[in-house]
Amino acid sequence: MNYLEVQNIAKQTIDYIKTVIKPNMNLREIRYLCEEKMLSLGADSFWYWNIGAFIFSGDETTISVSGREYVTADKLISDNDIITIDLSPQCKNVWGDYARTIIIENGTVVNHIENIKKQRMAKWFTNGRSSA
């Protein structure tokens, strides 16, 4: 498997998770679904500390955490949330590295940036997650 094929595993995984992610899903469930999807698409392992999917939401999306210290938070997605997913599939020692940020607004994944309600997101960034 070449680099582009491994990257495609990660891209397909993000495309998949965007169809199933919803409010009240636990970040740990999202990690599990992402890792299972990558394995089903041909990844044989995960190159970064054996973690296939780093999942962050809300204020956690602004921090940097070493894989050595990473623990997926036991946290639920809210109706208005921001989620960062960073994937690290590997196949036959070929690494992929693919990250995306997903916006949930009014319980729905926003697929195009122009569909984000600017006032709501501005409120998010100025007042914090709880008032979004």
Q: Where does each model-flagged region fall?
A:
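Active-site neighborhoods and metal-handling regions in enzymes and metal-associated proteins
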Residues: 1-132
